[in-house]
Amino acid sequence: MKKLQRIFITISFLFLFVNKGLTANENFYDKIDLFSEVLNKINKEYVDEIDQNKVMDSAINGVLQSLDPYSAYMSPEMFNSMQTETSGKFGGLGIEVGMEAGVVKVISPIDNSPASEVGVKAGDYIVKVNNIQVQGKSLTEAVDLMRGPVGSDIEITIRRRGIKKALIFKITRKVIEVQSVKSKTIDNKVGYIRLTSFNENSSAQIKGEIIEINKNKKIKGFILDLRNNPGGLLSQAIKISDFFLDSGEIVSTKSRKKSENRKWFARKGDVIKGKPLIVLTNYGSASASEIVAGALKDHKRAIIIGENSYGKGSVQSIIPLKNNGAIRLTISKYYLPSGKSISEVGVTPDIEISEANEDFKMNTKTDNQLNFAIKLLNG
């Protein structure tokens, strides 16, 4: 326990020192004094031997998660795993998750991933992992439970709105390869582009696909499918929005410091030359997806079809720490050209079409949202 005792002594000494002359923050430092006292009591009187690292990690994570659902602490192991996942190939279930009121919530399943193949949907709540309750655990702890070797099985219990009975899915972990851009021509008249995430190559790939589709002189219009796209790089959302606009504001961000507030504007040059554009969204469309859909809607450049988007209107920065871990911290909020915030509200479709039924599967005969968009463009 000597290591933990040194932590208590350091905390107490540090905040006794900085407390002098800081009357405006007295209550804040009193709370830290209280925190130190509580840790000391745990150290001396708790019934079992405690895992010192786990206690401190949970305390740090608790501070961050009290700010919003997206700020969190990542241990060195978690940070390393995150860096592996952003390389575009990793082992797992293939879901993007967040926290809502202490419950793990699916933001979106990745296309063709083990989770999407068994029927996990955006908006589902994960309540158990291998029969272990995850409610009350941190997001980091819940994600750790879901990790495992490629080829191993996992059972997750889900609650879904509108369904009384819990749903249980058995999933085999696989290597997840993220292909962010897919395209095709439908009925020789409609250019269809599916974007699953906003990574560093997305804008260049989309522009290349548009150029290729435009070689067909019979193309009447385009569909940009952002369903189940949890977001990604802000820079890519701006570039992709700019492809379809000739002028005007795309998005703005507001930070704690006014000097860091920013606005981005479109440059002249619509790559589809004014042809009709439809954007498909659903509850799994979040963050960067909402920037694109919101900007194109506000400028009346596209018709938004599908369901209301997720409502994640904030920017997170990954800040490395000395222990080789990191914190994910919200540093600013997005605002659409209309001045509206995306946070919690999301982007409302111009034409609302819900997923038809349990047989609904994107980009198939049961995809009523895509089918409606195709009919609209074909006239």
Model-derived regions: residue spans:
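Bacterial N-terminal signal peptides that target proteins for export
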Residues: 1-8
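Cysteine endopeptidase catalytic domains of the caspase/legumain-like
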Residues: 2, 303-304, 377
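Bacterial N-terminal signal peptides
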Residues: 9-20
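Cleft-lining beta-strand/loop regions that shape enzyme active-site pockets
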Residues: 21-31, 35, 39-52, 105-108, ...
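An acidic helix/loop motif centered on a single conserved Asp/Glu
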Residues: 50-68, 239
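PDZ/PDZ-like peptide-tail recognition elements
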Residues: 58, 70-108
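Conserved P-loop NTPase
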Residues: 316-320, 327-356
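Conserved functional hotspot residues or short segments at active or partner-binding sites
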Residues: 341-379
